[in-house]
Structures are given as structure tokens and as C-alpha cells.
Amino acid sequence: DQEIVVKSMAMEKVYELACRVADSDATIFLQGETGVGKEVLARTIHNSSIRKEAPFIKVNCGAIPESIMESELFGYSKGTFTGGNKDGKKGLAQAAHNGTLFLDEIGELPLNLQAKLLQLLNEKQFTPLGEIKPVQVDVRFIAATNRNLEDMVREGTFREDLYYRLFVIPITIPSLSERREDIPFLINHFLETFNHKYKLYKTIDKEVVQFFIDYEWKGNVRELQNTIERLVLISSAQQIELSDLSDKFKKATSHTKGGISGEGLNLKQKMEQFEKQILIQTLESSNTMKEASKN
């Protein structure tokens, strides 16, 4: 499930840029809504780089309590904390030596730690808690957020100098509503993944595929992934049908068969509708999702 699906023009541009900068040491700043696949892209960049054999260390800045964030990120020396590791602890920044440090949800990093992170980014060194001598590391940085850091800078909750230091190579990952042509291929990918995981042989009805193409995925790729996993497990028949969908889906979208009217749409929207119809026709003329993906 960590494979990135690249079929739409929007994702092709993202993927091409990511591959182009993968071997550089420049800091990459991933932006996008929740669930668009920022961590998947970060891992793809790492695995496409010369650092791929070294560690990929993820730091979820929103999940680690503020009280222990500094010790988790930078480590501490022997005897620094009562109840801590008696021999001290190596921090996540040091664990990422020669590899990639992925700073997820960077907008949640406490203001008091942002100066120390800035030093790490600028000098590739930091001082663990309780130590005097700094530790030098060779690390590639990738940061990600779904928040607007420019607004946070204006509000005084995020350092301006850190923002510009992170914003070297910005990559914005489109939402699923901006890459609807990827949805059939994502469905196929997740269906194969969960069939393999649970040793099942589920298929999916073409009406469900079109329903999902039309649906507004507020949780983006992650929501689609979770939905496919749930349907693979709960559908009683081998083929997943519209009747297997939860009430949430049935209330949110009215599913219609056949063509889609272009009345009242601008040129871009009409083109999107046309591309969607081509995808649907490809699916309908194929026996399986795998065959459709080849076409």
C-alpha cells in the first residue's frame, strides 16, 4: 500500500519533480490536504535517492507530546532525566544519519523548538539535552504539512526564517478531486493489496467504480484506501456491489448511470467530464480492473 499511483497529468508532474530532485540534498517541502499521500511521496523520494539504503526516519510533530518532543528529536545524555534511559538516548535526528529525516505535520512543532530545528537544518548539527558538544549528522530533510504556514508566520506561531529554510523545493500534492482519473487505478491497486493481505478474491462492480469517481473524497486517498479495505472485508458476495456501501455514501452522492450533461460547465470542467467518460468506457469494455489499467 506504499506504492504511489501515477496516471493523471497532475500526479505525473508531481512524480517527475520528485524524481528530479531525489538525489539532491535540498530540503523538500510537501504540501497538501490530509490523506493525499505526503508520507508515501516522501518514502518514494527517499527510495529513489542515493540514500535509499540508509534509514528513513519519520517524526510526527503532531503526535509526540510537547513535553518530550525535544528529547525524542535530539536525544539526551546519561543521567539527564530521572526515570529516563540510564545510558541516555539517541534522538531521531541522529538515527537518520546518512538517510532521510521526514518531519511530518511540521506546523505542529512547538515554537520553542523551531530555533533548534533551524540550527539542525542550517548546520547539520545539534546538541542533545545534557550535552555540551554538538553532534554532526548527514541528513536529508523532507517536511510536510496540511496547514498554511504563511498564515502561521503572520500569526507569529511559526518562525519566518524556518519557513523559508524549509521552503526550498515545494511540492504540492493534488487532492483526489483534482485527479479523479486516478481513482479507478487506485481502486485496482488497493483491491489487489487487500485481496492479497486477506487471501480473498474480491472484485468490484463497475457501478461502484463510477460512484467512487463521482464521490467527493474529503479524506482523499487515505479515505478511499480505508473504504476499499472495509468493503473487501464486509461484502458477503465475491463482487462488491453498490448495496455494500454504507449509508454515508448513499446519502452523500446520488449515483446516475449513462452520460453526464455538460450544460452550465466551463471548458475545463467539460474536458474533465469527457476524460471521465473515456475512463468509464474503458472499464466497461474490459473484463477486469487489471485489463482496464493496461488499456
UniProtKB/Swiss-Prot annotation:
Keywords: ATP-binding, Nucleotide-binding, Plasmid, Two-component regulatory system
PROSITE patterns: SIGMA54_INTERACT_1, SIGMA54_INTERACT_2, SIGMA54_INTERACT_4
InterPro entries: AAA+_ATPase, P-loop_NTPase, Sigma_54_int, Sigma_54_int_dom_ATP-bd_1, Sigma_54_int_dom_ATP-bd_2
SMART domains (alphabetical): AAA
Biological processes annotated in GO: phosphorelay signal transduction system; regulation of DNA-templated transcription
Sigma-54 factor interaction domain sequence ranges: 4-233
UniProt-recorded Gene Ontology molecular function terms: ATP binding; ATP hydrolysis activity
Keyword match Cell membrane: no
Entry keyword annotation includes ATP-binding: yes
Descriptive protein name: Uncharacterized protein in HyuA 5'region
Organism, scientific name: Pseudomonas sp. (strain NS671)
